[in-house]
């Protein structure tokens, strides 16, 4: 029996990983341009961390977590989201002691859900968190940052929804109102909603059951219960977004699926990916650090689904630079192969960022040249017994009608660098300089492969 991937956990093959890498690189560069630093946290955490942070009466904790006992009979969970782990790391290492933090992380998350387009049991997220900031200015920055990503990636068909969940006192009053409302229609509630009515009625608003939507639509609205400070916070956030030219709509039913949120919550969604349209979502969680044992620390963050982001990038016609080599070395014979290894490393030293593929596994000149053409390389570097004896190499353009040139090895790096640069300047290069940046060139050629 052949091994197969677990349902809902997908391989990202080479033809797709280039798109992932391109999208992730742009997202990372935007995040770091706002002063956020990367943190890496474990995939496995103690189960209690998620029960305390996400909330016992949530779909994630009740139905979706991958939880098991390790060899010490300790309950551990494969992280369903990253915020709790980042907060735990901050508490463990004293990152919140009289200091503010701007952090981001990325990696796989795990939830036992029904697999469908845009929803998987192993999925990838990029998370950005700002700890120690209480004002609406950082809320605005995080939302504006995400909008900058859409612009850099050339994405469209995204809409932003906002809401405020207010303070703990706001939620207490609103909870009483919800209990009164849903208790009056209890006979119409589904089983999950009846249970949530007793434990956490706000979770009813997050129900995906179509039969519940009409009841939810008529429920009281959180915004009508906001305390003055929360209302002012929300109003100032909207002023900042208006000033930045960010379009949004206020959705009073937006509550998010995690219990730790308060005040600002938001979601970027698209209609381009079917029912799983949320691309990026988050909110403020001012009480979570203290709840998990740290000092009182205001905080806000968002999470972005990479699979959905890549899917939207493709739906919007996004193009990824070709990742093929610049040069394919055709080496016929053992002496030529030895020389090919020598030349390839010398060229990598001379031209920073150059991509070279050396033919391995032998083959005739004709078969190797076919491989060179199939690789997408701009040039074939031809080596045979004659070239080895004369300390020269054949430089054959593969994307133009130019003739093959014989180049002395001592001049090869300069000649090749010049040709690659001319191809870029003339638009013949299969990668554009602004899409494939590398570091400065070696002094030998004064050229950096872009």
Model-derived regions, located:
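TRNA-recognition modules of translation machinery and tRNA-sensing kinases, especially anticodon-binding
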Residues: 1-450
